[in-house]
UniProtKB/Swiss-Prot annotation:
Family designation: Belongs to the glycosyltransferase 4 family. MraY subfamily.
Alphabetical list of NCBIfam families matching this protein: mraY
Lineage: Bacteria, Pseudomonadati, Pseudomonadota, Gammaproteobacteria, Alteromonadales
Main subcellular location: membrane
GO molecular function per UniProt: metal ion binding; phospho-N-acetylmuramoyl-pentapeptide-transferase activity; UDP-N-acetylmuramoyl-L-alanyl-D-glutamyl-meso-2,6-diaminopimelyl-D-alanyl-D-alanine:undecaprenyl-phosphate transferase activity
Organism from which the protein derives: Psychromonas ingrahamii (strain DSM 17664 / CCUG 51855 / 37)
Transmembrane segments: 27-47, 71-91, 98-118, 142-162, 168-188, 199-219, 236-256, 263-283, 288-308, 338-358
Assigned GO CC terms: plasma membrane
Enzyme class: transferase
Name this polypeptide is given: Phospho-N-acetylmuramoyl-pentapeptide-transferase
Record localization: Cell inner membrane
Assigned EC number: 2.7.8.13
Pathway membership, UniProt: Cell wall biogenesis; peptidoglycan biosynthesis
Record keywords, A-Z: Cell cycle, Cell division, Cell inner membrane, Cell membrane, Cell shape, Cell wall biogenesis/degradation, Magnesium, Membrane, Metal-binding, Peptidoglycan synthesis, Transferase, Transmembrane, Transmembrane helix
Amino acid sequence: MIVWLAELLSSQFTFLNVLTYLSVRTVMAVLTALAFSLFFGPKLIRFLQKFQIGQIVRQDGPESHFSKAGTPTMGGILILGAITFSSLLWARLDNSYVWIVLFTTLAFGAIGFMDDYLKVVRKHPDGLIARWKYFWQSVTALVLAVVLFLSATTPAELTFVMPFFKQYMPYLGLAFIPLVYFTVVGSSNAVNLTDGLDGLAIMPTVMVAAAFALIAYLTSHVNYAHYLYIPYIPKASELVVICGTIVGAGLGFLWFNTYPAQVFMGDVGSLALGALLGVIAVLVRQEILLVIMGGIFVVETLSVILQVGSYKMRKRRIFRMAPIHHHYEKKGWPEPRVIVRFWIITIVLVLIGLVTLKVR
């Protein structure tokens, strides 16, 4: 919206041209989303407290979590509001990627909202039944995959990129559709599983989004893309702004979500943010980098799969509790130690992921 106004008025006010620069819009997107979160955060927390929309704590969980019962949840509404508002304000709305990203984010957010609503407001212990949750996730992801496949204008948009290989970028064809499906649904549920401690999910999300901002910038510039042997996708430029909104909204939410948390994001936030990272990875053709940089999300998911599989087959548990962050709590680690160490691991993984762009 701002870009349109700036271009409309630039003939009379030339200084407005600065608002069309990608770098300026990205910084402003970060600051706008941050300000939105900080301004509306306290208001949302009071609203959630007033209507007793609070966290339900597992009785078999770590004892330190019992004090979290009743803490306002569904705070992901704040994150989605900040991302949507800032994106509509600072991104170029004639870029189809902007609308694809917002559709995916809000659709998965709606699924998470329904799950939270049933659990917290309607007091259904299991929330949205698992098969229905996966059904709607699958429908959304498949619609997204088909739209991206049919709207692709260059072969680069349907290639598969392998880190460490210069020339190995095979054309996927119809295989692109299941890749999109598993990336988006998998990422959504992985972030959801990680969101179990104060600030544990949001900060790695911010870090990965910041890295994807750089990757999207490089992908959208022909010289950088050719130099790094990555697909050249001009439309990816606006994903830099979108990633900026994630950083701003995430930091603003962390202000209230840091230990001890005043609010939790709930499924409305975690499912949406995971899907958002997934669709960005798909659009810049870097699904493998998402696995590397989001390694914490991957490990959390694998810990649940291994725990469930081991118990079903051997009647024995591998971890004291899954996801794995609860395992370390059960071992006696204080919650802040688990959180910060997982953050440190994410920083290392993000740096490794960025290095792979050059090491080929």
